[in-house]
Amino acid sequence: MAYKTEHITQQLRAAREAQKMSQRELSARSGLTQSHISQIERGTMEPGLGSLVDVARALDLEIVLAPKKLMPAIRNILDSASASSDVLTSDQRKLVGRLERWFAQHRGGFGSASEADTFKDSLALLRHLPLSAEEMDTFNEATARLDRSQADPPSRQELSRIAHAVRHLRNAAVHRDRDDAVPRSAYALDEEDDNA
């Protein structure tokens, strides 16, 4: 097997085994024969792109092309997401849930659909990324602003400030160093206007 696909096929096998799925079950889900899957996993057959996509999707995975410069952030997100299920506090889960429910009711209050989508996407990421105590304080403050405005909907300017705070939290959590010896990446997930 070519070195280029070896790590991908190893990840697919690990995903299948983690889901306690047999090759036969994977065969039924993917449409590939069990012997084809076995050959791919053993490295005796170089899988075609279509086969890789079929197997990945049968395992509830996606194969995507991403810009190389974003790989540190993507790896950080994937590492955080896989490790965060036991790490997130119930307070963080509650805050994200409250903001998601609030957002569902007040989506139209944002200045643009793009700003609303970014806010929603930021919340989705924050559901999986553990926050520090300081970041939780900022998150609590943003949520408290919304609580104070229950009687009167917040102005677009206030929504923009809250959205900026949530984006900042998301970026901080995504770019947080896992090891102090590793320098932080010099990029953001989206453009932010700090003068807003």
UniProtKB/Swiss-Prot annotation:
InterPro entries: Bact_TransReg_Diox (IPR050807), Cro/C1-type_HTH (IPR001387), Lambda_DNA-bd_dom_sf (IPR010982). Disulfide bonds: none annotated. GO terms for molecular function: DNA binding; DNA-binding transcription factor activity. Keywords: DNA-binding, Plasmid, Transcription, Transcription regulation. Residues 174-196 are annotated as: Disordered. SMART domains: HTH_XRE. The keyword Transcription applies. Residues 12-66 form the HTH cro/C1-type domain. GO terms for cellular component: cytosol. This is Uncharacterized HTH-type transcriptional regulator y4dL.
